[in-house]
UniProtKB/Swiss-Prot annotation:
Its main location: secreted. Residues 700-725 form a propeptide. GO terms for biological process: agglutination involved in conjugation with cellular fusion. It is a lipid-anchor; GPI-anchor. Heterodimer; disulfide-linked. GO terms for molecular function: cell adhesion molecule binding. Residues 182-307 are annotated as: 18 X approximate tandem repeats, Ser/Thr-rich. This is A-agglutinin anchorage subunit.
Length: 725
């Protein structure tokens, strides 16, 4: 009896299952390390190691289903980021992948109707939800990806090799933080299609690979981003590049795709990010070969509000990403193996075996800055900063057999509680410069027209723990009399029943006069000459800090008490006289104020002037649970050194040091930022066994080594059954 095509396919399927056992007993170690550095979130490192392929093959009614997983798997993620208030996430992530082998009739006109072709189908589904305990005000993050199917049909040829890998991932990030009296909603949609198809041999191979991705839409003040589908065919490279089109104050960004023919097998996944009125997108590439694939496809869509201008006829709008969108997501499809059966009188077939994708925690951050300028010299700056860290997870895998069909389920559970945050920060700044008469007593008599610069800065920081901080800063400066005033007000809502408010006002002005000191000693010629001249400067500074209140929303009672009030008045008289050899005056006045309150403040100011260029240093150190630190030092006009140290946070974790030194010939600026970090390490490991069902001659079980004797016997038994049936 001759060996028919159906018999050959049956034998090939059995050999494929036996090879899967060999794969499970012969691990292949793959080490993947991804390091991403971001200014806002520090360094995030993800390591996946080792990668051992474990497969299960089910043969039923002529259809072979191959279930693939990683066995064992260790995912280690370490991140260095700013310490933030702790909150607990409840996370559920389920993932399921199958690879089905079946046969179908070839539709080519040159092939007879009895020609059947082995068909490979890969299906991946995933669902991810995350929520916070309802007592902490609900925040939900969910991700649901569509089912992607790749079908590869290989016709008869001489040693063709065909491999297809698809990684469709569509993630939706939505964050809703509810805290009385405000509710903040944040949503971002990411679509990252990745499709790679390789066919090294160009002899009569018909392959098709289609990747479908849902459109990505983010609506925030009329901003829409749509990502079309990406299609990759055999021996081709498909890359998707995004472009942005800005129209007035609502923009639409559309991704355009370009296709080029190339024997290489590289697919670039592009994400489109739309912001109003301008956008910048960051895309990550995905490289796939027949043995290894890594796909990183981050996307975060954020848009800034639409702002109205006071002077539409002369309005310039610009939007820039001060901190480009970054996200770390890893999808790994590894150890694609080809099994070939060769016989001189029969065609050659090659079917790939591809492991399932592995998802890792992702970290996203984005900062958008929008500037609107009009004729009145007013400038509006809006900054939106979004930083979200998805918590860690653990993984479990189990099998279910129903009616002879075994299905493998990979579940990412249970959730883990980590110190994760979801922070939304926005700032609105208005700067106005007008030519008007200053109201200070030195300017009013002369009715001198001066340039008055006014600034109002409003910012709101909302953390997922319902701690909301709103600040308002206003300043006023006159170019003639150097009168300046500064007001700072901060309102912090720790919960729905507690409100803390602090207001600080500072006003200063400078009066200067120039005197001439003449020496009337006669020279031999009888003439007089000036020996020295000097300038004296008087400065007065007044600072006031007041107002802290607590409101109990349950009893509707308000208790307000003044924690601290300090008035700082410092005046300094300094004069510099220039002569041949004398230093006449050195004066320095320092003031120190320490306030003990929920926010501890230390202020040090120092003013000094001497003849020779020197540097004056002010050093301040404070250690408290909540701290705010400010130090300022000023020295001579010819060589100025300015030092500012600021630290303000819920916990003493972030310190910023800014040093500026300038002189006539050169200038030097040094910026040092020190961030206390917390390091988290997540280790996930699980072990599964592969199951192989080979007809009725060999049972199912788990194998750690290749039983050659039993396999040879099974092949002989099945071959005899096929040949003589």
């Amino acid at each position: 009896m001759t060996l028919s095509f159906a018999h050959f396919t049956y034998l090939f399927t059995i050999l494929l299952g036996l090879t899967n056992i060999a794969l499970a007993s012969d691990p292949e170690t793959i080490l993947v390390t991804i390091t991403k550095t971001n200014d806002a979130n520090g360094v995030v490192t993800t390591t996946v190691s080792p990668a051992l392929v474990s497969t299960s093959t089910i043969v039923q009614a002529g259809t072979t289903t191959l279930y693939t997983t990683w066995c064992p798997l260790t995912v280690s993620t370490s991140s260095a980021a700013e310490i933030s208030p702790s909150i607990s996430y409840a996370t559920t992530l389920s993932r399921f992948s199958t690879l089905t082998l079946s046969t179908e009739v070839c539709s080519h006109e040159a092939c007879p109707s009895s020609s059947t072709l082995p068909t490979t189908t890969l299906s991946v589904t995933s669902k991810f939800t995350s929520y916070i305990c309802p007592t902490c005000h609900t925040t939900a993050i969910s991700s649901l990806s569509e089912v992607g199917t790749t079908t590869v049909v290989s016709s008869s040829a001489i040693e063709p090799s065909s491999a297809s890998i698809i990684s469709p991932v569509t993630s939706t990030l939505s964050s809703t933080t509810s805290s009385n009296p405000t509710t903040t909603s944040l949503s971002s949609t990411s679509t990252s299609p990745s499709s790679t198809s390789t066919s090294p041999s160009s002899t009569s191979t018909s392959s098709s690979s289609t990747s479908t991705s849902s459109s990505s839409t983010s609506t925030s003040s009329s901003s829409t981003s749509t990502s079309p589908s990406s299609t990759s065919t055999s021996s081709s490279l498909t890359s998707t590049s995004s472009s942005s089109t800005s129209t007035s104050q609502s923009s639409t960004s559309t991704s355009s795709s370009s296709t080029s023919t190339s024997p290489s097998s590289t697919s670039t996944s592009s994400s489109s990010t739309s912001t109003s009125p301008s956008s910048k997108s960051t895309s990550a590439s995905s490289t796939s070969t027949s043995s290894y694939s890594t796909s990183t496809s981050p996307s975060l869509t954020s848009s800034s509000p639409t702002l109205a201008s006071t002077s539409p006829s002369s309005t310039s709008i610009s939007s820039t990403f001060t901190d480009s969108t970054s996200s770390l997501g890893s999808s790994i499809a590894s150890s694609s193996t080809s099994v070939s059966l060769y016989s001189p009188s029969t065609p050659v077939y090659s079917v790939p075996s591809t492991s399932s994708n592995v998802a890792t925690p992702s970290m996203t951050s984005s900062t958008v800055e929008t500037t609107v300028s009009s004729q009145s010299s007013s400038e509006y700056i809006t900054k939106s900063s979004i930083s979200t860290t998805i918590p860690s997870f653990s993984m479990s895998t189990y099998f279910t057999t129903v009616s002879g069909v075994t299905t493998m389920y990979t579940t990412w559970c249970p959730y883990s509680s980590e110190s994760e945050t979801s922070t939304l920060t926005s700032m609105h700044e208005t700067v106005t410069t007008d030519a008007t008469v200053c109201t200070h007593e030195s300017c009013m008599p002369s009715q001198t027209t001066s340039l008055i610069t006014s600034s109002i800065k409003m910012s709101t920081k909302n953390v997922a723990t319902s701690v909301s901080t709103s600040t308002v800063e206003s300043s006023y400066a006159c170019s003639t009399c150097a009168e300046t005033s500064h007001s700072y007000s901060s309102v912090q809502t720790a919960s729905s029943s507690s409100v803390t408010q602090q207001t600080t006002s500072t006003k200063s002005w400078v009066s200067s006069m120039t005197t001439s000191d003449e020496d009337f000693n006669k020279h031999a010629t009888g003439k007089y000459h000036v020996t020295s001249s000097g300038t004296s400067t008087i400065s007065t500074s007044v600072s006031e800090a007041t107002s802290t209140s607590s409101i109990d929303s349950e009893s509707q009672e308000q208790s307000s008490h003044l924690l601290s009030t300090s008035v700082l008045s410092s005046s300094s008289l300094s004069a510099t006289l220039s002569s041949d050899s004398t230093i006449l005056l050195f004066s320095s006045v320092s003031s120190l104020s320490v306030e003990q309150s929920p926010v501890t403040t230390l202020q040090i100011s120092s003013t000094s002037e001497i003849l020779q260029p020197t540097s004056s240093t002010a050093i301040a150190t404070i250690s408290a649970s909540t701290s705010s630190l400010s130090a300022t030092s000023i020295s001579t006009p010819s060589t100025s050194v300015e030092s500012t140290i600021e630290s303000s946070s819920l916990t003493p974790t972030v310190s910023s040091i800014f040093l500026s030194s300038s002189s006539a010939p050169s200038s030097l600026q040094t910026s040092v930022t020190t961030t206390e970090v917390s390091t988290t390490s997540i280790s996930i490991q699980y072990q599964t066994s592969s199951m192989v069902t080979i007809s009725q001659y060999m049972g199912s079980g788990s194998q750690t080594r290749l039983p050659l004797g039993k396999l040879v016997f099974a092949i002989m038994a099945v071959a005899c059954n096929v040949i003589f049936s």
